[in-house]
Amino acid sequence: MSTGKIIQVIGAVVDVEFPQETVPNIYSALIVTAKNLTMEVQQQIGGGVVRCIAMGASDGLSRGLDVTDTGKPITVPVGTATLGRIMNVLGEPIDMCGEIGATEHYGIHREAPTYEEQSASVATLEVGIKVIDLICPFSKGGKIGLFGGAGVGKTVNMMELINNIALKHSGLSVFAGVGERTREGNDFYFEMQEAGVVNVEKPELSKVAMVYGQMNEPPGNRLRVALTGLTMAERFRDEGKDVLLFIDNIYRYTLAGTEVSALLGRMPSAVGYQPTLAEEMGVLQERITSTKTGSITSIQAVYVPADDLTDPAPATTFAHLDATVVLNRSIASMGLYPAIDPLDSTSRQLDPLVVGQEHYDIARGVQGTLQRYKELKDIIAILGMDELSEDDKLVVSRARKIGNFLTQAYHVAEVFTGDPGMYVPLKDTLAGFKGLLAGDYDDLPEQAFLYIGAIEEAVEKAKKM
């Protein structure tokens, strides 16, 4: 192990000089022994000098401090010892429950599975949320993105999906909190304890491993914490297990890359993002895949800056996903939750050969009705409802009922709303929308369809109105 000295500190970026013959490799982990700080090599800039990112606060660093090259990348504990524990980017426990007794450690930088090793699946994952199961069904072993601006419900939807899938799913889950609120991470941990998914007394009985690099962490932590979580998920997958990987929020991973890129002296590209945006996203996303031994189904929240889906960060993420769930502020402003836009959300599973002809026809029928209503809104605003033809009046009436029927009470929102959460099986969802499109419920008031599960509840609700 060679030793070097710090020669420059600029925020989270540190330059270290080593003897010419022992310059560390890119992505090698270096340790500032006096401060017990880990750094990662990003560039070799000549003359034995390497430029590194600090994986922690660089406060108190000074020129001349000794730095040791470990000769290997950052390694983190993997395997069952990580279950039920909260770790940071380096795999160190931050839950005050003692050491992690892992026998194996993996480097966080690994190759994506080869084309021969990968395995595609067309099996559909039922999540019990009507709008998702109908319009943008998830695939087992697929990648799903939850897109939305600030405050439209990405984290609540993510938590409901964890509640509906992870709690009913017999496999293991990994949750990576990337640059999000510490309070949400804390709430998540205690909710998982209440649900029995995390067992503090017997961690080996837990079903989820948690890796946090939250908003207050330096950019180095936020840039690498997603890779730490992914490495743990890959280990479970390679054991032949079906793993769920939740990442909240993938945009903060991009943003950390932007912060680091500027400090490393790279020329910014569009909107100030790093020039390596597409490559950094690809390196992460290509590893999130299913192989012939096991599967990783990943659900990622994606913050959309200023509600602009054409922003380079969300636009780069789109290319990697199998299903996109787009949250719309205008739907949220009408008090309709989940605020998922059925016209913007897509899934490659919505194919008659995968979900069946009936499901496909119902989904397209719902979208067609909502699209026609969207087109008529301008006419209604100018001329009023009376100027519409009878057919168009019927379309408007059905579209409003469909919009209301797409709402649903969430288990995780029970504490705020007081309404008990509900899980709606796919067959009930299809039966309800089929009846609405066929006109079976044209005589019911549209308020009867708000926040109900199966369509029969609307009939009962209408009787009380």
Swiss-Prot record:
Q: Where in the cell is it found?
A: Cell inner membrane
Membrane-crossing residues?
Answer: none
Q: Which InterPro entries match?
A: AAA+_ATPase (IPR003593), ATP-synt_VA_C (IPR055190), ATP_synth_F1_bsu (IPR005722), ATPase_a/bsu_AS (IPR020003), ATPase_alpha/beta_chains (IPR050053), ATPase_F1/V1/A1_a/bsu_N (IPR004100), ATPase_F1/V1/A1_a/bsu_N_sf (IPR036121), ATPase_F1/V1/A1_a/bsu_nucl-bd (IPR000194)
Instruction: Kindly state which keywords UniProt assigns to this record, in alphabetical order.
Output: ATP synthesis, ATP-binding, Cell inner membrane, Cell membrane, CF(1), Hydrogen ion transport, Ion transport, Membrane, Nucleotide-binding, Translocase, Transport
The family database entries (Pfam families) matched by this protein are listed as:
ATP-synt_ab, ATP-synt_ab_N, ATP-synt_VA_C
Principal subcellular localization: membrane
GO molecular function terms listed in the Swiss-Prot or TrEMBL record: ATP binding; ATP hydrolysis activity; proton-transporting ATP synthase activity, rotational mechanism
Q: Does the keyword Membrane apply?
A: yes
- Sites where the protein binds ATP: G148, G149, A150, G151, V152, G153, K154, T155
Q: Name one GO cellular component term.
A: proton-transporting ATP synthase complex
Q: How does it sit in the membrane?
A: Peripheral membrane protein
Name the domain of life this protein comes from: Bacteria
What is catalysed by this protein?
Answer: ATP + H2O + 4 H(+)(in) = ADP + phosphate + 5 H(+)(out)
Enzyme Commission numbers on file: 7.1.2.2
Does the keyword Lyase feature in the UniProt annotation?
Answer: no
**Subunit structure, interactors included:** F-type ATPases have 2 components, CF(1) - the catalytic core - and CF(0) - the membrane proton channel. CF(1) has five subunits: alpha(3), beta(3), gamma(1), delta(1), epsilon(1). CF(0) has three main subunits: a(1), b(2) and c(9-12). The alpha and beta chains form an alternating ring which encloses part of the gamma chain. CF(1) is attached to CF(0) by a central stalk formed by the gamma and epsilon chains, while a peripheral stalk is formed by the delta and b chains.
- By its UniProt entry, which HAMAP family does this protein fall under? ATP_synth_beta_bact (MF_01347)
Role description: Produces ATP from ADP in the presence of a proton gradient across the membrane. The catalytic sites are hosted primarily by the beta subunits.
Which family is this sequence assigned to?
Belongs to the ATPase alpha/beta chains family.
Q: What is this protein called?
A: ATP synthase subunit beta 2
Q: Which gene encodes it?
A: atpD2
